[in-house]
From Swiss-Prot:
Disulfide bonds join C104-C197. One of its GO terms (molecular function) is ATP binding. Gene3D superfamilies: Adenine nucleotide alpha hydrolases-like domains, HUPs, Translation factors. ATP binds at A9, M10, S11, G12, G13, V14, D15, S16, L35, G128. InterPro entries: MnmA-like (IPR004506), MnmA-like_C (IPR046885), MnmA-like_central (IPR046884), MnmA-like_central_sf (IPR023382), Rossmann-like_a/b/a_fold (IPR014729). It is an enzyme of class 2 (transferase). The keyword tRNA processing applies. Coiled coil: none annotated. The active site is at C104, C197. Belongs to the MnmA/TRMU family. It comes from Salinispora tropica (strain ATCC BAA-916 / DSM 44818 / JCM 13857 / NBRC 105044 / CNB-440). Keywords: ATP-binding, Cytoplasm, Disulfide bond, Nucleotide-binding, RNA-binding, Transferase, tRNA processing, tRNA-binding. This is tRNA-specific 2-thiouridylase MnmA. Residues 147-149 are annotated as: Interaction with tRNA.
Length: 360
């Protein structure tokens, strides 16, 4: 796309500011927009390492002023609450481990925002994600693998990608910060966001407890079936977790115990040794295929099961209710609710074939 009208989603960070600058420099008619996603007073804090704060809104506006582009703030709080925050709580209550950033991309940035942008006459949405989107419509990993965000974009549809721009995919984060400095953007040295933006203090367990209440239950040894501890809410745990178990009876062999599973129906957390976490087969639902048509035959590819997780070779096959991945080497800590993203290795940058939500 050349010389089109685009909406730049500006979070208040360095990546989105430079992405907007590059879009304008490429000849596009750029308008900046900051999304007001929460009305929780705790999110209005200074020096935050999350996002979506009042400070972020001001940083985004200042960046737009430097770039001399129009700037607006869109109130998306109600939609964000329903599609991201409430979904986050419901998933934990169901014993799954959601990825709220992925859900925000799927339901807010590239759905609600994109839909409104198109309705207002914009041709595309520009974001600061570190990923590459070529003229062929294929989504690839960023050249900066340490910052690559193709995993959290793997849930998008081909239609959504066709109206998206990711100008930073060919740059490293160091290059982006240096460019921000050259352009006089005050956010050049602003720290990256790491927290869940709507959990202001970083205490996910406390946030869930306030929403779901206290529901005491048993912590059970997966080998013996014996009760080895108590918990105040199974929702506070995730598969692979080691810290915070507070077991009354340590393992006879003295080795650490990890969360193997969460069973909401019985409010039980099952624990066991690290090797019991190893998984060689993954079932997933709600597949989205963006690297080509839905495969009729099993595909040899690579898969990633967490935002910053290991990448392993696998054979992926379509099933009646989703897909099945046979991992060529076992992975530990595979949690239902996370995404499995399939890649086709390519010298020009690994290509995202598709994604699905891990069921078991």
């Amino acid at each position: 796309m050349v010389g089109v009208r685009v909406l730049a989603a500006m979070s208040g960070g360095v990546d989105s500011a430079v992405a907007a600058a590059r879009a304008a420099e490429a000849g596009h008619d750029v308008t900046g927009v900051h999304l007001a996603l929460a009305r929780n007073p705790q999110t209005y804090r200074t020096g935050a390492r999350g996002c979506c704060t009042l400070e972020d809104s001001r940083d985004a506006r200042r960046a737009a002023d430097v770039l001399s582009i129009p700037f607006y703030v869109w109130d998306m709080a109600d939609r964000f609450q329903a599609d991201v925050v409430d979904d986050f709580v419901a998933e934990y209550a169901a014993g799954r481990t959601p990825n709220p950033c992925l859900r925000c991309n799927e339901k807010i940035k590239f759905a609600a925002v994109l839909d409104r942008a198109v309705a207002l006459g914009f041709d595309a949405v520009v974001t600061g994600h570190h990923a590459r989107l070529g003229a062929d419509g294929l989504l690839r990993r960023s050249v900066d693998l340490a910052k690559d965000q193709s995993y959290v974009l793997g849930v998008l549809t081909r239609e959504q990608l066709s109206r998206s721009m990711f100008p930073l995919g060919d740059s490293t984060k160091t290059q982006v910060r240096a460019e921000a400095t050259r352009r006089g953007l005050a956010v050049a040295d602003k720290p990256d966001s790491h927290d869940i933006c709507f959990v202001a203090d970083g205490d996910t367990r406390g946030f869930l407890a306030r929403r779901l209440g206290t529901t005491p239950g048993d912590v059970v040894d997966g080998d013996t079936g014996e009760v080895v501890g108590r918990h105040t809410g199974a929702y506070a745990y995730t598969v692979g977790q080691r810290r915070g178990l507070h077991l009354d009876r340590p393992a006879p062999d003295g080795r650490p115990r990890y969360v193997l599973s969460i069973t909401p129906k019985t409010n039980t957390v099952t624990v066991g040794p690290a090797e019991a976490l190893a998984v060689s087969q993954v079932q997933a639902r709600r597949p989205v295929w963006i690297g080509g048509p839905r495969p009729a035959d099993p595909v040899e590819c690579e898969v990633q099961l967490r935002a910053h997780g290991d990448v392993v070779p696998a054979t992926v096959a379509v099933t009646d209710d989703g897909l099945r991945a046979e991992l060529h080497q076992p992975l530990r800590g595979v949690a239902a609710g996370q995404a499995i993203v399939a890649y086709r290795p390519d010298p020009a940058g690994d290509i995202v074939l598709g994604s699905a939500t891990i069921a078991a």
